[in-house]
């Protein structure tokens, strides 16, 4: 299954299919991607879409009108750092894991990114969808 769609939500791993093209290289030597929407995202290339940074795509206007996309794959701290300008992206050392590293869900208009970078944070983000209200649960497993 490539995605699951309800009336209000679309659940994906990375993001919805779109056309990705390289725009250049940033100061860290990383590729800068840009994206163009597809006429019908449902029939696009899901092999590629599964590995996209959904927050980057969302920030570059790859969205679904009147839907909220729940994604993972890429750590939510990226969105907090580079889009919301809060905290750090990824800690360079274990000593950098502190309150400045935001691993809670990245939430904005049309997106909920749940990836907590569990391997480093020890946290798993969950999002309960209720017809009456939304409840965010961020549970840290301190025993394992």
Show which residues each predicted segment covers.
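Acidic, His/Gly-enriched loop-helix segments that form or flank divalent-metal centers
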Residues: 1-113, 117-122
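Short, surface-exposed beta-strand-loop junctions and turns on beta-sheet-rich folds
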Residues: 18-20, 134, 144
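Secondary-structure transition/turn motif
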Residues: 13-16, 139-144
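C-terminal regions of proteins
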Residues: 119-126, 135, 141-142
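Short acidic-glycine loop/turn motifs at beta-strand connectors
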Residues: 7, 128-133
């Amino acid at each position: 299954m490539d995605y699951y769609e309800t009336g209000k939500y679309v659940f994906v791993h990375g993001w919805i299919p779109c056309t990705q093209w390289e725009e250049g290289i940033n100061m860290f030597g990383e590729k800068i991607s840009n994206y163009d929407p597809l006429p019908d995202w449902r029939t696009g290339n899901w092999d590629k879409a599964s590995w996209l940074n959904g927050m980057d795509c969302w920030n570059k206007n790859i969205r679904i009108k009147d839907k909220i996309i729940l994604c993972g794959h890429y750590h939510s701290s990226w969105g907090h750092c580079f889009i919301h300008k809060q905290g750090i992206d990824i800690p360079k050392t274990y000593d950098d894991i502190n309150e400045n590293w935001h691993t809670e869900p990245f939430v904005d208009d049309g997106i909920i990114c749940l990836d907590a970078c569990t391997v480093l944070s020890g946290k798993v983000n969950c999002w309960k969808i209720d017809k009456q209200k939304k409840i965010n649960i961020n549970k840290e497993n301190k025993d394992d």
